[in-house]
Amino acid sequence: MSITSEKKKSLINIYAIKEDDTGSSFVQCAILTERISNLTEHFKVHKHDHHSKRGLLILIGRRRKHLNYIKRKFGNEAYQELIEKLGIRK
């Protein structure tokens, strides 16, 4: 269910604004999107796992808050670019 450290490092390298940038909203959105996609695949097999579904909803809400921050702080262009890179719809 969790992502490997290698996958997390590759996401950090792709979405980091500057070197050693692990905490920016862009990186956190990318990591949350990866975790959400892993949980979505889990639910295709385990349809009745309601406890993990609550965790999924929490992750989606957390990602939504980061995306709203990016839109407010960096503008609509950065927001749209990130959504396209992540492959999520709005």
From Swiss-Prot:
Q: Which GO terms describe its molecular function?
A: rRNA binding; structural constituent of ribosome
Q: Which Pfam families match?
A: Ribosomal_S15
Q: Out of the domains of life, which is the source?
A: Bacteria
Q: Which Gene3D superfamilies match?
A: 6.10.250.3130, S15/NS1, RNA-binding
Which GO cellular component terms are attached?
cytosolic small ribosomal subunit
Quick one: a GO biological-process term for this protein? translation
By its UniProt entry, which InterPro entries does this protein fall under?
Ribosomal_uS15 (IPR000589), Ribosomal_uS15_bac-type (IPR005290), uS15_NS1_RNA-bd_sf (IPR009068)
> Which CDD domains would you find in this protein's record?
Ribosomal_S15p_S13e
What are the record keywords, sorted?
Ribonucleoprotein, Ribosomal protein, RNA-binding, rRNA-binding
Q: Which family does it belong to?
A: Belongs to the universal ribosomal protein uS15 family.
Give the protein's biological function: One of the primary rRNA binding proteins, it binds directly to 16S rRNA where it helps nucleate assembly of the platform of the 30S subunit by binding and bridging several RNA helices of the 16S rRNA.
Quaternary structure (record): Part of the 30S ribosomal subunit. Forms a bridge to the 50S subunit in the 70S ribosome, contacting the 23S rRNA.
UniProt-recorded name of the protein: Small ribosomal subunit protein uS15
In its UniProt entry, the species of origin is given as Wolbachia sp. subsp. Drosophila simulans (strain wRi)
